[in-house]
Amino acid sequence: MNRTNQLILGAVVLGSTLLAGCSSNAKIDQLSSDVQTLSAKVEQLSNDVNAMRSDVQAAKDDAARANQRLDNKVFRICK
């Protein structure tokens, strides 16, 4: 996901550079502002994904502990 976002950001920067020859300064400034906004959004999404990773790992750990407790109970009953 991060690589895809970098490619998109690179395409936006490249596109704005190519358009610089036939654009006014106001349009260039607007594109630059848009790129900065997109960069901030990409960074926020990356932070959100990283936060979710730790939550997912915690949920996996809880599920593994619950499954182990169930396995232990079944083993005792069958014993």
Swiss-Prot record:
Coiled coil: 28-69
Keywords annotated in UniProt: Cell outer membrane, Cell wall, Coiled coil, Lipoprotein, Membrane, Palmitate, Peptidoglycan-anchor, Repeat, Secreted, Signal, Virulence
Principal place of residence: membrane
Description of the deletion phenotype: The integrity of the cell envelope in a lpp null mutant (double-knockout) is not affected.
Membrane-related topology note: Lipid-anchor; Peptidoglycan-anchor
GO molecular function: lipid binding; peptidoglycan binding
Record SUPFAM superfamilies: Outer membrane lipoprotein
One cellular component (GO) term of this entry: cell outer membrane
Lipid addition sites, S-diacylglycerol cysteine: 22
Location(s) in or outside the cell: Cell outer membrane; Secreted, Cell wall
Coiled coil found in the keyword field: yes
PROSITE patterns: PROKAR_LIPOPROTEIN
Modified residue annotations for N6-murein peptidoglycan lysine: 79
Subunit structure: Homotrimer.
Role according to the record: Plays an important role in virulence. A highly abundant outer membrane lipoprotein that controls the distance between the inner and outer membranes. The only protein known to be covalently linked to the peptidoglycan network (PGN). Also non-covalently binds the PGN. The link between the cell outer membrane and PGN contributes to maintenance of the structural and functional integrity of the cell envelope, and maintains the correct distance between the PGN and the outer membrane.
Protein name (database record): Major outer membrane lipoprotein Lpp 2
Gene field: lpp2
